[in-house]
């Protein structure tokens, strides 16, 4: 059971880092694109931020559950 928890945490951390890298790379390309239309934030930015926090929360829960067993 401990091995599965460790593997799950490692996968969650890798997903978090990959998402952060993709968001950082995407934000770096904004200076080449034309100015966005005024209005609310794009949904892709919101979804990326939500995904990062979700993966971080899942990793934290997995760490807590793993440390209690």
From Swiss-Prot:
Keywords: Cell membrane, Glycoprotein, GPI-anchor, Hydroxylation, Lipoprotein, Membrane, Proteoglycan, Signal. Glycans are attached at residues 34, 36, 38, 40. The modification 4-hydroxyproline is found at residues 34, 36, 38, 40. It is found in: Cell membrane. A lipid is attached at residue 42 (GPI-anchor amidated serine). It is a lipid-anchor; GPI-anchor. It comes from the Eukaryota. One of its GO terms (cellular component) is plasma membrane. Residues 43-69 form a propeptide. Residues 1-25 form the signal peptide. Contains 4-hydroxyproline; hydroxylated on Pro-34, Pro-36, Pro-38 and Pro-40. O-glycosylated on hydroxyprolines; noncontiguous hydroxylproline residues are glycosylated with arabinogalactan. Proteoglycan that seems to be implicated in diverse developmental roles such as differentiation, cell-cell recognition, embryogenesis and programmed cell death. Belongs to the AG-peptide AGP family. This is Arabinogalactan protein 24.
């Amino acid at each position: 059971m401990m091995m599965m928890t460790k593997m799950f945490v490692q996968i969650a951390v890798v997903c978090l880092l990959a998402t952060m890298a993709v968001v950082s790379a995407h934000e770096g390309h904004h200076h080449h694109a034309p100015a966005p239309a005024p209005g609310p934030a794009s949904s892709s930015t919101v979804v990326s931020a939500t995904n990062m926090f979700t993966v971080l929360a899942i990793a934290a829960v997995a760490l807590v559950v793993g440390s209690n067993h």
